[in-house]
A protein has these predicted regions:
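Extracellular/surface-exposed low-complexity segments
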Residues: 330-353
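The leucine-rich repeat
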Residues: 8-10, 33-43, 64-66, 86-88, ...
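Leucine-rich repeat domain C-terminal region
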Residues: 265, 277-333
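Consensus "Asn ladder" position of solenoid repeat domains
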Residues: 6, 27, 59, 81, ...
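Leucine-rich repeat
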Residues: 15-18, 47-50, 69-72, 111-114, ...
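Conserved hydrophobic beta-strand positions in leucine-rich repeat
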Residues: 1, 22-24, 54-56, 74-78, ...
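Conserved hydrophobic position(s) of the canonical leucine-rich repeat
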Residues: 7, 19, 30, 51, ...
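LRR N-terminal entry segment and analogous cap-like coil->beta motifs
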Residues: 1-10, 15-33, 97-98, 112, ...
């Protein structure tokens, strides 16, 4: 069923047993998921047991969420819609919670075990509303979710345990709180974008995520330590700048193919010897505006020099500007400054105060 860019409101299509696809891109006539409109109405696509694809990108869908009673649904695309949140099943909600508490209620996907892609972008949700913790618990086939609500959310990210097929986890610039997920058991994960939230605590260790290519957790409120990367051989991009991370820079030997390590504007003080010596494809390292003590800074420079000796190359940028401990600018020792000069002569752009 195709009505993209026609201006036709989303019709009632209940009990269409062979219907597989509904496509209504950029339909600007206001519609809801219910007929008649409102919470007392009936879900327009109930009884469509073979419905697989719901493409409503840019459609002016307003109002509350339905429970998607379509067991074959694979794709729900609700990017740039005007859904306000709430709805779903109102029974069995946690004590003290109502449907209006949620930008996306916890139970709307409980019949969607085949769901692969869930995309939702809306600026119309209520400020301070949250994501249901159980949202994806029935979605064992989920590969890709993208949720963006323009900084209006609060509360934590949904439970992601048991999502062994998950490849992309995007929930950026939302205002989410709590701690970062470890993606344990999600060994297919490729891309993580959780930047621009209010996550606190530590960055967990990431283990056996052999497909992980990029991990973006910058611009949060992370104030703990950093875990290790263990058997993350395909990680290229790690961004965790603009947080309040403390402790030591972790050992990156378990992510030897890292290209970009961006950690400026944190409170890191220590360095684990060997952490960077084996990251031989590194192109860009930014540790500016941290709190390393001189011994840590010296060891770091020693390892960068070892890195170059192991894999001679130019074009690498290293930013170590404004390293201060207790407010005092930290300068490397003479031996390490000599190594910096050698790296610069080899074509490395090493920035120091």
């Amino acid at each position: 069923f195709y009505i993209s860019s026609t201006g036709i409101p989303l019709p009632q299509l209940r009990n269409k047993p062979e219907l597989k696809t509904i496509e209504a891109y950029w339909n600007r006539s206001s519609s809801t998921f219910f007929e008649p409109a409102g919470a007392s109405g009936t879900y327009k696509f109930s009884g469509c047991n073979k419905l697989e694809n719901l493409y409503l990108y840019g459609a002016n869908i307003t109002g509350e969420w339905p429970v998607f009673t379509n067991p074959q649904l694979k794709i729900i695309d609700l990017r740039y819609t005007s859904i306000t949140g709430g709805g779903g099943k109102t029974d069995a909600l946690p004590g003290g919670y109502s449907a209006s508490t949620y930008a996306i209620p916890p139970n709307i996907l409980e019949d969607c075990s085949e769901l692969q892609n869930f995309w939702f972008i809306s600026s119309s949700v209520a400020s301070g509303s949250g994501l249901g913790y159980e949202l994806f618990e029935s979605c064992s086939s989920l590969r890709y979710f993208n949720i963006y609500c323009y900084g209006k959310l609060s509360g934590g990210i949904p439970n992601l345990s048991g999502l062994g097929n998950l490849q992309y986890a995007y929930a950026y610039w939302n205002g989410l709180t709590g701690t970062l997920p470890s993606f344990a058991g999600s060994n297919s994960i490729y891309g993580v974008q959780l930047q621009g939230n209010k996550f606190t605590g530590s960055i967990p260790s990431y283990t056996n995520l052999t497909n992980l290519r990029f991990l973006y957790v910058h611009n949060n409120e992370l104030d703990g330590t950093m875990g290790e990367f263990i058997n993350c051989n395909n990680l290229y991009y790690f961004y965790a700048h603009n947080n309040r991370l403390v402790g030591a820079l972790p050992d990156f030997s378990g992510a030897p193919n890292l290209r970009y390590i961006i950690l400026f504007n944190n409170n890191l003080t220590g360095y684990i010897g060997g952490a960077l010596s084996g990251v031989l494809r590194m192109n860009y390292l930014d540790l500016s505006n941290n709190d390393f003590v001189q011994s840590a800074l010296n060891q770091l420079i020693d390892d960068l020099y070892t890195n170059y000796q192991t894999s001679p190359r130019g074009g690498v940028t290293i930013n170590l500007k404004n390293i201060r401990n207790n407010g005092v600018l930290v300068i490397p020792s003479e031996e390490q400054l000599d190594k910096v000069d050698q790296l610069r002569n080899a074509g490395w752009n090493v920035k120091l105060d």
